[in-house]
Amino acid sequence: MIKKDRVKRGGVIKTHIRVVEGYRPGPGLPTKQRTIKSFGYLEDQPDPEAFMAMVAKFDDNFKDTVPLRIEVAANAMMYGEENRRQNYGYKFLEAVYNLLEINSFIENFEKSRKFRVEYSPCDIFKFLVFARVLHPDSKRASCQLKDGFYGMCTDFTLPDVYRSLDHFADFEVELQRHLNERVKETIGRDLSYAFYDVTNYFFEIDFPNGEEDLRKRGVSKEHRTDPIVAMGLFMDSNGLPVNMSMFPGNTSDSLTLQPTMKDVKDSYGLGRLIVVADKGLNSSKNINAIVNNGDGFVFSQIIKGKKGQRYNEKLFDQSGWTSNEQGTYRYKLFEEEYEGKDKDGKKEIRVRKVLLYWKKTEADMAKRKREEKLEKAARSVKNNAYSIKKGVDEYTKEAIVDKETGEILGNTKKLRSVNLEKAEHDAMYDGYFCIISSELEYDERKMRQVYGGLWQIEQSFRIMKTDLYARPVFVRKNEHIRAHFLICFIALLIIRIIQHRMGEKALSAERIARTLGAATCQVLKGGIIHLDDVGGAIAFQKALNKKGEIVDTLAYSDRDEIAMDYKLIQDTFGTSLYNIYPRQELFNKFLKNITVA
């Protein structure tokens, strides 16, 4: 039936049109209504009469559907095939996978290497990519679920999977080149800026296996002591991954940029690049290499310590700042000369743009964090306790004193105290930030805008670690480690392409995976498919915050968040199927029509 709901949107009363049906959620329970399809607001339609005629036709077709008679044996067992749920949500991932023509690449690579085995590397690779999105786990645990995908060919064993990893590592570089070409052809690659960052992933092992092992102890981003591997990631201006490179865990972040950048430019035939990175990649060697290659850079710059002292005079000079009306933001923009080296190692004077700015919100946040650390330091000193946790001992200091007089002497007794001098010194830099760039024509807004794009690569790392469970890593061999991260890279690329297609309505990686994981079905007798409810999470009501952004409130709505997300995904892929019991031929046709336009 057609239901018209009067709702208030933007201060205006509108008529929300939807087709609903009645159902009984359980024996003895009152009937409820559920939405079959939502058509939007009547007042927003250019031709309301034609619009309602279309809704009525949909309603009639839905009501006129021939009822199905499904027979179920009274002695049917719980663990029979008819009662097995299989996922079909992976088909939306497969549409992007097919767009990238990964199967064709692997098949051609096998032919060129005359690689012949009894199992299908194509099937294994595809399965591992989809499992990484929907059920991220170890290779062993993932293979235990291989029969849970509708229509997917999974005729392989766990040993086949491990053997395939060696093969996958062989085409790590070539596949990334292929993916770049496919992205350029089908979506468009915007490399006006190349965003670069490095992270690392840990292994729950005690010791690496030798000098050649990628797993090394190094500076962990998560402050762990386990062996790690490092990953350098390039991303384009659309937020789509471009290139991934792996390094031993003890490699300094700053040493990864030049080899990765050279590989990207040589492999992809790129012209001038403007590299955007944080201060961890900002070194004189990197800057010299970038400029000598005819490329550009936008880096954040340390303003504390020896490396940042050159800016202290301008930073603490109260004149020359440009401020906003509220006094919550101010900046200085100027050019400076610096000493660089040409390709022959000869020194020369070069010029770059420097932006110093201060934000009150950042200053307030830095103050709060420091006060919290000082409280921890005071408790640590009081209890004479040490900690390996980050920040706990940042504001403590030690002195060797004479037990009798307190005079500082050699080798008698350690006295710990709160380092208030360091806290006062750090407070001077609260809220200040520095960006440097080779692009002399950039103004203040442009420099902040370009550097601000780095959040997308940071988000990509979070997706890989949190949503794709890229760590801890369970494989051991270098080839298997490279294959594992290649699979994670492609899973990330597929998610990013889906988000790119969604535009401003893009869902988070977690919600995409949750929704597609909930798209399950059962194959019944007589060529009937039972589609499970793609739902199960109550949506919260929305409201505008002080910044004019739409955010969740604490109040429940009458809608299902997963169901809404599934509709958005179907709309993105140009499909629409909400029948509970479609015939198998109709269902297969629906799956076949899931494509990326």
Residue ranges and their predicted role:
Residues 1-122:
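Conserved glycine(s) in the ABC-transporter nucleotide-binding domain "signature"
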Residues 2-3, 16, 26, 103-597:
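Anion-binding and metal-coordination hotspots
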